[in-house]
């Protein structure tokens, strides 16, 4: 299971980069443009994804969920204000941190107890939760694509099936 | 890996039902309402997800990818015209077919060779591709949430993390 969770995370990095590459092709103002949607703008969506991913690796590294949520809240405003290139860099450095962490195989199946403020304690592992980080990213990439279309622009392909074809067909 | 893929699919069924439950609370016309987004309406998004999922289980059951794509094309118009309750029923029956198929453990790791019209042959297994079915569903649930907000309505929570908390905390 852990190898699969690691591979899914690598897909997540590829999919985020597809979105950044596409956003950098568009007029600069699109990134902060107000759009009536799930979030006020695409920068708000990417900040939310970044701060969630940051929160989870803090939890994986021993922080409590409430401390991780507090950290995210503290960084929210400054993260939302960033420009697309700065955001791309933040995502890149965070993915490097994840990859370093996930390469320590013993981390993947280390038992975790997560105290959720609203629903008690969950006993889990990093490899069980990592698919949530990826699934959460996919969900918000789905938001971003709809928001881009709403603003009149196409998005970028980010399907896991496409990623599998690209990575596996080359090796075939 | 296969148990995890099965569990991820069960999450997908739960997440789809969350969306159907929410859509059924809203004014009936929302389902077919034209919205400038990734698809012309929410019914088009759910039809696309349904026909993709149908296509994949046909491939898992031995059909070629091009035959499965042809089947989806054939059913497209009639699927898009369905009302929300009919769509919910289609999804339910398809998920029962998936669960029956996935309970045959030997199916999960059966070698598959998939001829993609545009990028050659991929050697894979059902359990390796199943996460694509789920990830694809999550992506389009992300579209639907943005489309609902665009139309002025909140969506429903469908996070994998929430699903894990709900299913694991009860058993703790």
UniProtKB/Swiss-Prot annotation, chains A, B:
The keyword Metal-binding applies. A divalent metal cation binds at residues 48, 136, 140. One of its GO terms (molecular function) is metal ion binding. Coiled coil: none annotated. Keywords: Metal-binding. It holds the Pfam family DinB. The keyword Metal-binding applies. Belongs to the DinB family. Homodimer. This is Protein DinB. It comes from Bacillus subtilis (strain 168).
């Amino acid at each position: 299971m852990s190898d699969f969770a690691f591979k899914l995370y690598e897909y997540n990095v590829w999919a985020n980069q597809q979105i950044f590459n596409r956003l950098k092709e568009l007029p600069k103002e699109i990134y902060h443009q107000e759009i009536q949607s799930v979030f006020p703008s695409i920068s708000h969506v990417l900040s939310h994804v970044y701060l969630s991913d940051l929160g989870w690796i803090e939890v994986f590294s021993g922080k409590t969920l409430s401390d991780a949520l507090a950290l995210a809240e503290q960084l929210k405003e400054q993260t939302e204000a960033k420009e697309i290139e700065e955001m791309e860099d933040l995502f890149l450095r965070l993915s490097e941190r994840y990859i370093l962490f996930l390469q320590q195989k013993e981390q993947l199946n280390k038992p975790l107890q997560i105290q959720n403020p609203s629903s008690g304690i969950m006993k889990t592992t990093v490899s069980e939760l990592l698919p949530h980080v990826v699934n959460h990213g996919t969900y918000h990439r789905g938001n971003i694509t709809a928001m881009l279309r709403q603003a009149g622009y196409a998005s970028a392909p980010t399907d896991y099936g496409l990623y599998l074809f690209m990575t596996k067909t080359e090796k075939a």
